[in-house]
Amino acid sequence: MELSLVVPCYNEEGNVRLFYDEVRRVFKNKVTDYEFVFINDGSTDATLDNLKSIYNESKYRDNVQVVSLSRNFGKDSAIYAGLSYAVGDCVCIVDADLQQRPEVVLEMLEILHNNPDTDCVAAYQEERREGKAASAMKSGFYKIINKIAEIDFVNGASDFRLMRRNMVDAVLEMTEYHRFSKGILSWVGFNTEYIPYTVEERASGESKWGFGKLFRYALEGIVSFSTFPLKLSTFVGLFSFVVSILYLIVVVCEKLFKGIDVPGYATIVVLVLLLGGLQLLCLGILGEYLSKIYIQSKNRPIYIIKEHLGKK
């Protein structure tokens, strides 16, 4: 098998058929040895029924797999499940909403074929079709995480990428429960070439990624690939100590040389609130890391398969 398309699906009933037909149209006479690996990530609409219909109607059932998870485990877990079931020499992660065009996949394939030393071709968003505020926040996230993380993140890069089998196998060895795919795909290394692409409008439906979900995902990435927040607690403590010493010196000098008594009640209230807030912040950061360790120590599966159609 030359190519596997890993397609995570969550409530994409209006898109999966359009995606399937469009890929077949674009790939016709250009790519023949390929498969679809659809991952139903606990959808609550008719996504699974539509995927079963695609599988049952396909004249070439050998090139369609439908993997249905027992509940919604999240896109990153669905991607891991898809990579586990993909059998192609090259594997491409692509969304079902047609915002990532099949023509770009052909471009990626051509680059891999012409460059044997390249292990991965990843796409980054050349143009963001979103509000200025959202675009600024995403750019800010990449600037922050690149300063504090142990690996580099390309601004605008997504999970949309084509990988050779050796890289896919390396990603599958990363069995952490809390998954941040952008970081994992960068952490494993390998020679990666980045190409620009334009995000198209969704073929159907609305995006599942609101501000709150994006914020939690960004926090997940920072905690997963940086220990800087833990070190920040040390810096905050040291800064508070230095400020306290300086303030003490000021109070003593004013008392000895000017005879001025500093009002005690207001000072105490401010210091208690300040130090209490800093302590809670540091405890919250520590708790975030401890919670990840706690969940990982349970050794729970990353995903659970409820149903599988097709041949692996």
PLM features per residue range, with description:
Residues 5, 23, 82, 97, ...:
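Residue-level signature of catalytic and energy-coupling elements of molecular machines
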Residues 8, 26, 54, 69, ...:
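Amphipathic alpha-helical segments that mediate coupling or scaffolding at interfaces
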Residues 71, 96-98, 165, 197, ...:
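Short, conserved catalytic or interaction motifs in soluble domains
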